[in-house]
Amino acid sequence: MSVFAGKHVLIVIENLPAPFDRRVWQEATTLKENGAEVSIICPKMKGYDKSYEQLNGIDIYRHPLPIEGHGAFGYLIEYSTAIFWEAWLSCKIFLKKRFHVIHGCNPPDLIFITALFFKLFGVKYVFDHHDINPELYLAKFNKKGFFYRSMLFFERMTFRAADFSIATNESYKQIAIERGGMEADKVTVVRSGPSLKRLRITEGDPAYKKGRDFLVGYVGVIGVQEGLDLLLESVKHIVQKRDDVQFAIIGSGTALDEIKLMAEELGVKEYVDFYGRVSDEKLVSVLNTCDVCVNPDRPTEMNNLSTMNKIMEYMALRKSIVQYDLKEGRASALEASLYAKNDDTLDFAEKIMFLLDNEEESRRMADFGYDRVINKLSWDYEQVRLIDFYREVLELPEKAKVAVY
């Protein structure tokens, strides 16, 4: 008998579509593979514009999200629209087939508003803590005030509404306990372990190097706090000394146009390719071609306490890494990475060049990271934590065999 046969889990995402949100999709497919019925509510975005579709037996309901918020008014419109559609679609799904759990994924910390209504019917609320929004606000706007206090308020309300919480690392678990007031035994760490089925090592494609000897890669969001401006300054340091390195930047975000303009202004445009959001196949192909991968996240409190998916994806593809010295970045990569002095773009550039010019050391670091993922951090290990967590949420009395694929 499957572990969760007869159980229905509704997953709600506000800021990304499924299956694009890789962590959520891994969680959803793991629950489905172990017998649960799974439905997802998420926004429509480019390439994910069907109002309804079923993938791998998972029902996906997508709603319009007219704008991505900028400033107080923009965020008000975005979040109000999302809350309306989440509430409406939740009711529609509940009437079609009762769900037992709402699994809410932030940002923002507002999904509890929908969950509170269904708690009246015995539905449990699981909060999947992806981002620490007060710190995210500070990283974006660098000021405290009414909106910062609002972030803290909604975070507290989210934890109070939650029956259980999932943290992506130990730092987030401490926030759930100390700032959110949750009991320690109600918070479980489930890391965003990379899927080794998706991230397969290949020869790559030399065409991405554009005729140069080396390729340095970045994958992730392109926003203010991700430090792509710092990376471009490091690129400038490198191209002033050598012309044999190409850079590949994969991802999109609110700062993309600004970063492209900056590349032109710094005179490094011909050395940097912006690929935008790409398919998994292309992402894996580009990263497999890279000699070194980077994470230029700014040393903010948000980034210091957050585990970035890109780090473990680099490790899963056997790449050495350069990043700034942040707590959770170091906790994930350990010896797979070199750590530049925070905000020191010259030091960052020099560490990239060191790895490019010292193949043996780069390979040693890459092998360390790969072994760490294979033996400890991959989704094969994390999904067992998720299954055990959901057994507790659903009060299943006896352990059943877990499907690990």
Please describe what each predicted stretch is:
Residues 91, 110-121, 146-165:
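Membrane-proximal helix-turn-helix segments that form the acceptor-binding/catalytic region
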Residues 226, 281-286, 295-316, 322-332:
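Nucleotide-sugar-dependent
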